[in-house]
Amino acid sequence: MGNSRFFLIMGAALFLGCGGPTLAQRQVESAPAVHALQDGQFEDAQKKANLVLDKEAQTPEARLVRAITRYRATTKQLYLDGRTAVIGAFDGGLNQRYLHSTAEQAEADLAAVDEDLAAAQKGSNVSLELCLACWKDVDWNGDGRVNIRDERLLQIEVDEKGEELPEDDPRRRPTFRFDHGDIAWARAFVGFERAVLDVVLAYDFSGINEAMREREREGAKRIVFRLIDKSRIAAAKTRLLESIEQSAACRRAYLEETDDDREWVPNPRQK
């Protein structure tokens, strides 16, 4: 009897000792990464999130911070590489190898973003407060300078009546509280982007070059894009179905919300 009681006590102690961190502990651990992200210090935020995740890989707040910083880096690089591919296509012809490597890298990077979002989605009571329009000196389009378009990109420029908000109106720069439903929204968004990239990777678009040469001679009659990887079409279908699933989860989460706290996407009962 004494031995049985001993093993029961030890088992309970081990079980409780192996439990994950509490919400308060998670928030304290992730606070430096969250604050860096709130200040628009994206690289620093990712480094600090990685430090947290090195200790506890499933910390949802740190995963969410890293997902956002990874997404920003991925989309910025994709924009730069895509612009290079388009300019090259008009200048000397489409570089299929460059286009393929660009799309392949972007899809892999977005897969890592989704992995972080999926981990964050499993957490309980996950939330993140961000004022997106408060991020300053961010070169969103990667042209090497920050102009008024960069500064206003994430601002709310008009009110509910369609009238322009004054520059000093705080409604231009609201702070949103992102929560569980918004993570599903983000996963759906990323999934649709990955599906597009899978379609790009499925085809050889170098037929554009032949069509352009034909047009110079006698006018192009058609452009042929050859399917080179059927598995990518199947992957695109999978991504689309997953995204539809996440969209449905997002809607359910929004409709179930009973609070009204700085919503990114409000339900009919929220502001």
Question: For each of these PLM feature ranges, what is it?
Answer:
Residues 1-8:
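Bacterial N-terminal signal peptides that target proteins for export
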Residues 8-17:
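Bacterial N-terminal signal peptides
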Residues 19-32:
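Bacterial Sec signal peptide processing site at the extreme N-terminus
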Residues 66-67:
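Residue-level signature of tetratricopeptide-repeat
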